[in-house]
């Protein structure tokens, strides 16, 4: 039984990088549409932010749109993953507080379920990094070789 468990653990450990890649791709896809929509009509986003009580709505419209768009590309390529994850978490926390909290948990009712899942995935990327299938890994490998 222990041998079977060890085989299972070995396989699980080898699947870490593909799993981290999948998390990054899902998050990049998830942030793409909101980022694109914000940039398509940033003034409407600022007006909406103002209507829901977000401080400095124009500035925060640009900040959230920029963070999400940067997040899409950085997550896609696995570059600066641990760094971009933190501002994306902040964007999700603000979204939960200002938009989703009042609807409760279920995603089907515009609740905070999906933003919470994003936060959990982003925390995993902060904890484990972007994996072997990333520019972060290539840069780290290159730095090791050059020293």
Task: List where the protein language model places each region.
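Extended, low-polarity transmembrane helix blocks
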Residues: 1-40, 58-66, 70-147
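Perimembrane loop-to-helix junctions flanking transmembrane segments
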Residues: 45-56
């Amino acid at each position: 039984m222990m041998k079977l468990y060890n085989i299972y653990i070995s396989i699980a450990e080898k699947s870490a990088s593909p799993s981290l890649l999948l998390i990054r791709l899902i998050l990049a896809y998830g942030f793409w549409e909101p980022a694109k929509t914000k940039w398509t009509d940033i003034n409407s986003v600022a007006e909406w932010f103002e209507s829901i009580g977000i401080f400095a709505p124009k500035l925060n419209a640009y900040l959230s749109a920029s963070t999400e768009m940067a997040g899409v590309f950085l997550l896609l390529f696995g570059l600066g993953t641990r760094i971009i994850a933190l501002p994306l978490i902040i964007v999700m926390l603000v979204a939960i507080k200002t938009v989703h909290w009042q609807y409760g948990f279920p995603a089907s009712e515009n609740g905070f379920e999906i933003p919470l899942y994003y936060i959990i995935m982003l925390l995993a990327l902060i904890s484990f990094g972007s994996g072997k299938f990333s520019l972060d890994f290539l840069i780290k490998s290159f730095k090791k070789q050059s020293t």
